[in-house]
Amino acid sequence: MNRQSWLLNLSLLKTHPAFRAVFLARFISIVSLGLLGVAVPVQIQMMTHSTWQVGLSVTLTGGAMFIGLMVGGVLADRYERKKVILLARGTCGIGFIGLCVNALLPEPSLLAIYLLGLWDGFFASLGVTALLAATPALVGRENLMQAGAITMLTVRLGSVISPMLGGILLASGGVAWNYGLAAAGTFITLLPLLTLPRLPVPPQPRENPFIALLAAFRFLLASPLIGGIALLGGLVTMASAVRVLYPALAMSWQMSAAQIGLLYAAIPLGAAIGALTSGQLAHSVRPGLIMLVSTVGSFLAVGLFAIMPVWIAGVICLALFGWLSAISSLLQYTLLQTQTPENMLGRMNGLWTAQNVTGDAIGAALLGGLGAMMTPVASASVSGFGLVIIGLLLLLVLGELRRFRQTPPVSDAG
């Protein structure tokens, strides 16, 4: 990575064919999952006319994802990771085919949608954990920051493209097209993934999966560094749940429908800018301190967001949150991968990803509870400033993370 540039260096895609294959597979997978994410709630709403039923499907899928992350972490530390990745992707694609066939029936089954949602949520997250655990072996630990930033850009770009494409498909061909193309895209991802080298795991004693998972929890709690990283990650994800208040806040700002879209686009845009300008982040000597400060700054941006007098200022605050949270997340990812023992990478990546899933759900629930007691403006500002106080306390308490120093890596990627 070029020390003189703040911009992200994409040369890793040229110099590491295995990472290029993962990049391509991940992008196709994100677009495929995005098509699914648009189709499922629309189909359930059309069948039941019940927002509760739509919410139930999201909750069930989220629960299956959480279990899949836990199981995937254990499997990724026990079995050859390439096989786990391929098995998970292929099995997930079978579930998409099931959704497509169900949608083509004269009377689609609601129960089938719920069950296949559980199936796909479980196997999709199982493969994600194995892929995360394999990344250090594919790019080298010295290139993890660069790989993480490129991955973040991939996720953001795919997250923008897939809903638009999904909406067009719904308008022109119905939900069956979304499911069919999601299945096709998932099986296409197997082609680049088949080119990956073997990804064996370090030798370790066979033990009960629950005991193996418990060992990961013990490691997390016993390590002030890794534990602090996981805690910060969960809090940042909780803060991002402020999006549930966008519709109510848009009414107070008297925003048009087109302008409301800018609220939803602001955080991804800020995160993309954060990833693009992360060129020198890998060379920071005190990544823990930068992580803590950027996290507190992101909370402050959320607190200020709702009390802005005009919506444009609110959008700027959200973009600032996206930028600062991207910096924090990139440092979390890199330190987690570099400071976790190889034989525990699968389980720790599973736990780290799971706290992202649960943090978002907890944040949304807390904001919903606050919204029942106070105005949307007060709810957003109280949650943001409350997180600022917690963040400042953690800045003092997490001494090992704050003082952590590293030798800047010398990348061979460019």
From Swiss-Prot:
Do the record's keywords include Cell membrane? yes
Q: Which family does it belong to?
A: Belongs to the major facilitator superfamily. EntS (TC 2.A.1.38) family.
Q: List the CDD domains.
A: MFS_MefA_like
Instruction: Specify where it is mainly localized.
Output: membrane
Kindly name one Pfam family recorded for this protein. Answer: MFS_3
Q: Name one GO molecular function term.
A: efflux transmembrane transporter activity
Which terms are listed as keywords in the entry?
Cell inner membrane, Cell membrane, Membrane, Transmembrane, Transmembrane helix, Transport
Taxonomic lineage per UniProt?
A: Bacteria, Pseudomonadati, Pseudomonadota, Gammaproteobacteria, Enterobacterales
Q: What does this protein do?
A: Component of an export pathway for enterobactin.
Give residue ranges on the Cytoplasmic side: 1-21, 77-83, 131-156, 200-218, 278-287, 337-356, 400-414
Organism, by scientific name, is Salmonella typhimurium (strain LT2 / SGSC1412 / ATCC 700720)
GO cellular component entries: plasma membrane
Instruction: Please give the name of this protein.
Output: Enterobactin exporter EntS
